[in-house]
UniProtKB/Swiss-Prot annotation:
Pathway: Metabolic intermediate biosynthesis; acetyl-CoA biosynthesis; acetyl-CoA from acetate: step 1/2. Mg(2+). Can also accept Mn(2+). The gene is ackA1. Belongs to the acetokinase family. One of its GO terms (cellular component) is cytosol. Homodimer. This is Acetate kinase 1. GO terms for molecular function: acetate kinase activity; ATP binding; magnesium ion binding. It is found in: Cytoplasm. Its EC number is 2.7.2.1. It catalyses: acetate + ATP = acetyl phosphate + ADP. It comes from Neisseria meningitidis serogroup A / serotype 4A (strain DSM 15465 / Z2491). Catalyzes the formation of acetyl phosphate from acetate and ATP. Can also catalyze the reverse reaction. The active site is at 146 (proton donor/acceptor). ATP binds at residues 17, 206-210, 281-283, 329-333.
Length: 398
C-alpha cells in the first residue's frame, strides 16, 4: 500500500458521502454516508472492513458535524495521519474550469460564481470544502468537476438556438454532467480493448437513477445529452428528460401550476416513476413489466427507445461508432435493457451475444456483441471515486 491515502468527499444538500482510498491499488479502506443533515435526526454510517455502524449527529447535524465525526472515526482506526489530500466532487464548474484544480481562494470564488448553474449542489460542495479545510488543516484540497470533461464540445453542440445575448449574459448553454465517470470509462474502455483512446469513436451511456449519454472522439467529449441542467436528455428515474419547453406555459395556464411546481414535477415526479406510477427503481420496473404491469412496461419501453434514439444521434456526433459502452448501475447490471437497446441498433452493425451479455454483470467488464458485429458493445464498470483520487494525488504531488 502507498503511504498516503486520499479522502474523497461528495456533498449533497442534506448528505455527505466519503471514502478513503489507496490511490495505488484503488482499495477503499473506509467509507461513510451522512444523511438527513440539517435535521434533528441527522446521522452518519461508517463502513470499515465490511462492518457498518451508525453515529448520531444530532448535537452537530450539519456538514461540519459530519466531517468532525469522520475525523474521529479515522483517528479510531489510525488512518487520520495517513491522509495526504482531499478530493471533492463539484457538480458545476461552468465555463471556468476544463480540468480538476488545486483549491485556493480564487477557486472557491469560482465555485460560488457557478452557483446559479447548480443551485442545489454547488452551495453544498462549498460547505463540505470549508469543513474539510477547517478540520483537516494543512492538507491540500482538490476539486473535480462533473462538467469539465464536456468543455471540449464544439460550439454547434453546446449552444442553444436562442438569442445569443442569453448565452453571453447568463451562460445559457449545454454543460452536461457525469464528466468524471465518462473520463474514467473512456480510459478504461481503451485499456480493455487494447486500443489508444484517440483512435476510438465511442458512445458511452452512463445509466443510473440519473442517466446521460456522451459522444467521445479523440479521447474528448463531442456532445452529451444533459444540458444546462441534468434534466435534459434521456428518460431517467424521476426526471422527464427531453420535453417541449412549452409545457411550462401549458401547465401554468391549464393546471394552474407555478414554475417551481412544474420544475419539481419534471425533476422529481417524472421519468420511470411518472410513467409507471410505481417506482423510480429500474429493477422494480423490469420485474413488474415482466409480470404484465402496463405502466411498468411502458416506462421500460420508453426508457429503451429514447436511449436507442440517442445512441444513433451520438454516433453522428462521434463521427462514427467503434465502441458502444454501457456503465452506471443500470448500464452495468441490466442485461435486459442492453439486449433490447442493441436490438434497435442492427443498422449500425451491432448484434448481441446473449451469453456474454449475461456474464457482463455485477462488476464484470465484457464485450457483449458477436464477433461479426461492425462495432463492439462493451460493459465497463465506472469508478468516479477512484478518478477523483487519481486527480487529487496528481495535483497534490503525492
Amino acid at each position: 500500500m502507498s503511504q498516503k491515502l486520499i479522502l474523497v468527499l461528495n456533498c449533497g444538500s442534506s448528505s455527505l458521502k466519503g471514502a478513503v482510498l489507496d490511490n495505488g491499488s484503488g482499495e477503499v479502506l473506509l467509507s461513510c454516508l451522512a444523511e438527513k443533515l440539517n435535521l434533528p435526526d441527522a446521522y452518519i454510517t461508517f463502513k470499515v472492513n465490511g462492518e457498518k455502524h451508525k453515529v448520531d449527529l444530532s448535537a452537530h447535524p450539519d456538514h461540519t458535524g459530519a466531517v468532525e465525526a469522520l475525523m474521529e472515526e479515522l483517528k479510531a482506526h489510525g488512518l487520520d495521519s495517513r491522509i495526504g489530500a482531499i478530493g471533492h466532487r463539484v457538480v458545476s464548474g461552468g465555463e471556468l474550469y476544463s480540468e480538476s484544480i488545486l483549491v485556493d481562494d480564487e477557486v472557491i470564488a469560482g465555485i460560488e460564481k457557478c452557483i446559479p448553474l447548480a443551485p442545489l449542489h454547488n452551495p453544498a460542495h462549498l460547505l463540505g470544502l470549508r469543513a474539510a479545510q477547517s478540520i483537516f488543516k494543512d492538507l491540500p484540497n482538490v476539486v473535480v468537476f462533473d462538467t469539465s470533461f464536456h468543455q471540449t464540445m464544439p460550439e454547434v453542440a453546446y449552444k442553444y438556438a436562442v438569442p445569443q445575448e442569453l448565452y453571453e449574459k447568463y451562460g445559457l448553454r449545454r454543460y452536461g454532467a457525469h464528466g468524471t465517470s465518462y473520463r474514467f470509462v473512456a480510459d478504461e474502455t481503451a485499456r480493455f480493448l487494447g486500443k489508444d483512446k484517440k483512435d476510438l469513436r465511442m458512445v458511452i451511456a452512463h445509466l443510473g437513477n440519473g442517466a446521460s449519454i456522451t459522444a467521445v472522439a479523440n479521447g474528448e467529449s463531442r456532445d452529451t445529452s444533459m444540458g444546462l441542467t441534468p434534466l435534459e436528455g434521456l428518460v431517467m428515474g424521476t426526471r422527464s428528460g427531453d420535453i417541449d419547453p412549452s409545457v411550462f406555459g401549458f401547465l401554468a395556464e391549464n393546471a394552474n401550476m407555478t414554475i417551481a411546481q412544474i420544475t419539481e414535477m419534471l425533476n422529481k415526479k417524472s421519468g420511470l416513476l411518472g410513467i409507471s406510477g410505481l417506482s423510480n427503481d429500474c429493477r422494480t420496473i423490469e420485474e413488474e413489466a415482466a409480470k404484465g404491469h402496463k405502466g411498468a412496461k411502458l416506462a421500460l419501453d420508453m426508457f429503451i427507445y429514447r436511449l436507442a434514439k440517442y445512441i444513433g444521434s451520438m454516433a453522428v456526433a462521434a463521427g462514427g461508432l467503434d465502441a458502444l459502452v454501457f456503465t452506471g448501475g443500470i448500464g452495468e447490471n441490466s442485461d435486459i435493457i442492453r439486449e433490447r437497446v442493441i436490438g434497435y441498433l442492427g443498422f449500425l452493425g451491432l448484434n448481441i451475444d446473449q451469453e456474454a451479455n449475461l456474464k457482463a454483470r455485477f462488476g464484470n467488464a465484457g464485450v457483449i456483441t458477436t464477433a461479426d458485429s461492425k462495432a463492439v458493445a462493451v460493459v465497463i464498470p465506472t469508478n468516479e471515486e477512484l478518478m477523483i483520487a487519481h486527480d487529487t494525488a496528481r495535483l497534490s504531488g503525492l
